[in-house]
Amino acid sequence: MASTSVRAEFPDTVRTPPAPRTPRYRSVLLPLSFLAPALLLLGVWVIYPALQTVRRSFYADEDGTDFVGFKNWDRMLSDDNVHTAFKNNVIWILIAPIAVVALGLVLAVLTEKIGWASVFKIVLFMPLAISLFAVGVIWRIVYQQDPDQGLLNAGAKGIHDIFVKPGVLPDAQPGQGLSPRFALTKPIDAGGVAKLAVTGIAPENVPGGAKQAVTPKPEQGKITGVVWRDFKPGGGRPGVVEKQEVGIPGASVTLLKDGKTVGSTSTGDDGSFTFDDVSGGGYTAQLAPATFRAPWRGVEWLGPRLVTSAIILAFIWTAVGFAMVVIGAGLSAIPRDVLEAARTDGGNEFQIFRRVTIPLLMPVLTVVFVTQMIGVLKIFDIIYAIAPGSVRPDATTLAFEMWQRSFSGENRFGFGASIATLLMILFVPFLIYQLRSQRRNA
């Protein structure tokens, strides 16, 4: 029986039907539908106000209906306060971003070397959890000039008083028998008693440990004396030590003869003092100038000369935590084998940091730097919180001056709009640079 074989033949290629084409308008509408809410908010809250601000800068301050051209710009560019604001903005730009990036880099590197890095980062990052206005309120207290209130001056006063001790009678006045220089008006001989009365001392300003004043007895070959607060409640006799009149402890007393100092001593708790080995006469007892040295009043951090530097320091304290965290994230992304290869080639830690770590971190450092640059250009709230009203003209910036002219009672909206437009013009180069940098690193 003959058999037949059947050979199956397959086509060379298998053709699949083409996928249905999505209409072009649908491929455009779908992304736009997701972007529409963000674009709407961007247009309402950013683009439209920005365009209106530019338009308003060409209209009069009063009602915004009278077109004045570039008059607002002319006034702005010739205004002394705007010049000060621009100068302060330049100072901010030259100091704050560089300091923030440098400190953030150092702290980020150091935190990699310690075991409790997370706690350290949280502490430094904490200022960012509160607003700049609240930061300003905190630093306003820190910067108080009175050492009893301001933390910074309290610490400085403690160091200052170690080397230059304040006098015990900064506000005293000479009593009966004393010249304006707190010296006896009559000479005294050996064996005499010098009575140095002082007045004008409030009860709360009497040195601590003061006891009832006692007139010492004359002693041969010595000059004794007393320094006391010559005031008795209810009335008393001037120049006479009486009950309820206290001595002044710790007062410096000098003994002079022929205009030269021949001895010095200090008073006890009852105000008494003694000069030994004295002979002859013609001496003068005098309270030394150190007795009246005023206590250190503190640095005027919020005065016209230092207010901008003080505010920049507060800003750096706030921003350095952000820089440290971002740079620390960049450090953790650096391949460890690159660093190990550098060590194998004989590089020390400083060389590795300068020639390997920093170049690899440059994109991150650039982002942090530009971000801080934009932040200091629009700085406002921390200045409002820290600077007292009397020195705000010295601490002003362009953003603060814009608010000052527009919303603080002057109501010069055209003038303020011209400052705001100038700020936008200054922002543009930094924004373009940051966007290009992000695209390069993407």
Q: Residue locations for each model-derived region?
A:
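Transmembrane alpha-helical segments of polytopic membrane transport and secretion proteins
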Residues: 1-34, 116-120, 435-442
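Transmembrane alpha-helix signature in integral membrane proteins
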Residues: 80-110, 307-315, 423, 427
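Membrane-water interface segments at the C-terminal ends of transmembrane alpha-helices
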Residues: 39-62, 120-188, 282-293, 314-316, ...
